[in-house]
Amino acid sequence: MEIGPNHRFKDVSYIESPNQSGPFAPELPDTIVIHYTAGASTESAIRTLCDRKRKVSAHLVVGRDGAVTQLLPFNIVGWHAGRSAWGERTSLNRYSIGIEIDNAGQLSERDGCYESWFGRTYPAEEVLHGTHRNHSEASYWHRYADEQLEVVEAICAALIQRYGIQYILGHEEIAPSRKIDPGPAFPLDSMRTRLYGSPLA
Ligand SMILES: [Zn+2]
């Protein structure tokens, strides 16, 4: 994954979202925030993230097949983190690049079927039974595709190299009272271990 002088990945489709603030302050961004879309398709996620009325955006969207779409250059502040805090920092949009991954999120089990909040059912092999880091009991989660996990790790490695990213965080870690993405199906701790040598954010 190669990043050009215009702060965009080369060979990646680009659709610019109008939902953006100005450039980052000097020395920033130094953080990546990982999200899932909790939606029905990559196309609908991109539509939402480019809709002025919705007032949300992200720098990148990763489809189920691993295809990447960039919506903002990496030097521009996006609107993905919302009310959030990490250490002494608040409003993490000012510090971070947002990556949205196409995934249905938490699923509910009924008679051996697993259903998303928008009513689609998923086969057992696409479902993980696991405990969220912010919860005490296990529940059901849509698995990420291997292609998605591979490309997200490659994206993070490229952003670390280009921008000196120091923190890779889940939305669930910076807004634990209101967000549960990317959830236990995303191997955040093992990815941080591979990239930084430690599972800790
Ligand atoms: Zn999120």
Pin down the residues of each PLM region.
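Short, low-complexity, polybasic intrinsically disordered segments
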Residues: 176-201
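Acidic/histidine-rich, metal-coordinating catalytic segments
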Residues: 163-178
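Active-site-adjacent loop/helix surface patches within enzyme catalytic domains
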Residues: 2-166
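Low-complexity, intrinsically disordered regions enriched in charged/polar residues
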Residues: 43, 168, 182-185
